[in-house]
Each structure stands twice: as C-alpha cells, then as structure tokens.
Amino acid sequence: MIKTLPAFWAVIPAAGVGARMAADRPKQYLQLGGQTLLEHSLDCFLGHPTLKGVVVSIAADDPYWPGLRCASDPRIQRASGGRERADSVLNALLLLHAQDAADTDWVLVHDAARPNLARTDLDRLLSELADDPVGGLLAVPARDTLKRADANGRVSATVDRSTIWQAYTPQMFRLGALHRALAECLVSDVVVTDEASAIEWSGQAPRLIEGRSDNIKVTRPEDLEWLRQRWAGRR
C-alpha cells in the first residue's frame, strides 16, 4: 500500500549575506542555470502536492526579492529576517501561528542556498517521519576521515566517523515543538546553527534520514562552480 505523505509548511530563512562567497550580493541571489539559488530551493516545495504554503524570511532592506517572479506567488509569504538564522525561522513560525496554523502541523525548514534538493529525498523525509513523535532531518553519513585540530592547526586526534553524520536540510518538526525549542534557546542565549540543534537542546532526539550527498549547501565559490558544471551536464 502506498503511504500517504503528510501536508506540510515550508520555511526558508533567506536573510543571510553569505560573506564567505565574497560576491556582490547575498549568495541566495546568485545565478544557477537561469534562476537564483533561492528560486531553485523553492521549486521542489512549490511543486509538491501536499504543500500548505511557504514562508520566506527576508531582510527588511533586501532589494533583490521583489524582482523575483516567485515573490508574487500567492503560496509564498514573506516574514521579517532576523539577526541570526534562529531569529528568522522563529519569525516565520510566528507568522504561521498568527494565521492559525496548528501546533501539530509539520514544518520543513530548508536552506535558501541548498538548491539541489531531489524530490525523492523530500518524499522520503515526509514518508519516514509522518508518524514520528519528534521529527528529523536529511543527513549524510560521514565518508572522509575526520581529524580534530588543536589550537595550532595540528592534528590532535582522528575521530571515529562510524557514528558521525553531516546534517542537511530540510529539517522536519512539528510547528509547536520547534517554536518552543527555538524560543527557549533564544531566551537562554543558547546558540544553535540548525533547527535540530534546538530540538536536541529541548531534550529530544531527532531522527536521521539518509539523503543524497549532492544536496549541498553553497558556502564557498567552488560549491557554486560544482553545481554549475552539474547543471550544464543536464542540458
């Protein structure tokens, strides 16, 4: 029997500047195959039949978002971007709550500069976590040998990679649980770099769902070059 995929909201925090790219604009607005990275990141969600809507968190002075065709898509709402990722995601969740979204609704948070999400990975995440009491995230088992460095940049230890995973997105949690976890982290001055970290801090254990390793986040110029070469091969 085919499992019915759950309905969900998508949240895209897109208020960062991506300083390591050393580009003339925030990295989510760099071009890849005729569209911005942000547009590609949105596409997989906008084409999904169980999507309830999307919230994109944008900086107040962002001059690029209004020029995108997707900015006028009625399925996409804009929330205020915050100082950190957690602030931007929390603002998006507050917007959903203001529109009477339920605490039990699923929310998928995805990086604005992670444009190569496969539909098969999205469906696997939704299917595997549909009945999970906590939620979880796409991730990839560590493949390379890992080294721990000392203060002088020398190897202090080789890390056992057998239980190490790289955290990817989307990350999928219930609206109410994620809202509470992020709010508590901010009040307690706990720095979290992804949503799973906030859920972990609240005492829960998110589930890891193995995804494709090519669902990379664009962080440095070579990441974008790799994707451009891959896109060119699709023609």
Swiss-Prot record:
SUPFAM superfamilies: Nucleotide-diphospho-sugar transferases
Keyword set, alphabetical order: Isoprene biosynthesis, Nucleotidyltransferase, Transferase
Disulfide bonds: none
UniProt pathway annotation: Isoprenoid biosynthesis; isopentenyl diphosphate biosynthesis via DXP pathway; isopentenyl diphosphate from 1-deoxy-D-xylulose 5-phosphate: step 2/6
Site positions for Transition state stabilizer: R20, K27
One Pfam family per UniProt: IspD
Keyword Cell cycle assigned: no
InterPro entries referenced in this protein's UniProt entry, alphabetically: IspD, IspD/TarI, IspD/TarI_cytidylyltransf_bact, ISPD_synthase_CS, Nucleotide-diphossugar_trans
GO MF term list: 2-C-methyl-D-erythritol 4-phosphate cytidylyltransferase activity
EC number: 2.7.7.60
BP-aspect Gene Ontology terms: isopentenyl diphosphate biosynthetic process, methylerythritol 4-phosphate pathway
Nucleotidyltransferase keyword on record: yes
Site feature (Positions MEP for the nucleophilic attack) residues: R161, K217
Substrates-to-products reaction catalysed: 2-C-methyl-D-erythritol 4-phosphate + CTP + H(+) = 4-CDP-2-C-methyl-D-erythritol + diphosphate
PANTHER family, alphabetized: 2-C-METHYL-D-ERYTHRITOL 4-PHOSPHATE CYTIDYLYLTRANSFERASE, CHLOROPLASTIC
Family per similarity comment: Belongs to the IspD/TarI cytidylyltransferase family. IspD subfamily.
Physiological role: Catalyzes the formation of 4-diphosphocytidyl-2-C-methyl-D-erythritol from CTP and 2-C-methyl-D-erythritol 4-phosphate (MEP).
UniProt name for this protein: 2-C-methyl-D-erythritol 4-phosphate cytidylyltransferase
UniProt source species: Pseudomonas putida (strain W619)
Gene that encodes the chain: ispD
